[in-house]
Amino acid sequence: MLGSKGLSPTDLRGMTDGHLRVELKNAKEEVFKLRFQSATGQLAHNARLRAVRRDIARIYTVMRERDIGIRSVQEEVSQ
């Protein structure tokens, strides 16, 4: 689950590009819902919004690493 302590950059680097895109889509939907809850005063845990935004940044970072060739899926699997 996004925003949890179990989602680390290492875990993200082990995912395929397709799975990263799915996780990114889910995280963006969650941010939308959390922002709506925050605006209406229903958000109980403000830290959750911050955690999900950071997860989105982590996903974008891993995707960018692959785009510019810093890391690839094969490198992470072999290590």
Curated annotation (Swiss-Prot):
Sorted UniProt keywords: Ribonucleoprotein, Ribosomal protein
Molecular function GO terms recorded: structural constituent of ribosome
GO CC, one annotated term: cytosolic large ribosomal subunit
InterPro entries found in the cross-reference section: Ribosomal_protein_uL29, Ribosomal_uL29, Ribosomal_uL29_sf
GO biological process per UniProt: translation
Pfam families reported for this sequence: Ribosomal_L29
Transmembrane segments: none
Domain of life: Bacteria
SUPFAM superfamilies: Ribosomal protein L29 (L29p)
Family per similarity comment: Belongs to the universal ribosomal protein uL29 family.
Protein name, entry field: Large ribosomal subunit protein uL29
Organism encoding this protein: Tropheryma whipplei (strain TW08/27) (Whipple's bacillus)
Name of encoding gene: rpmC
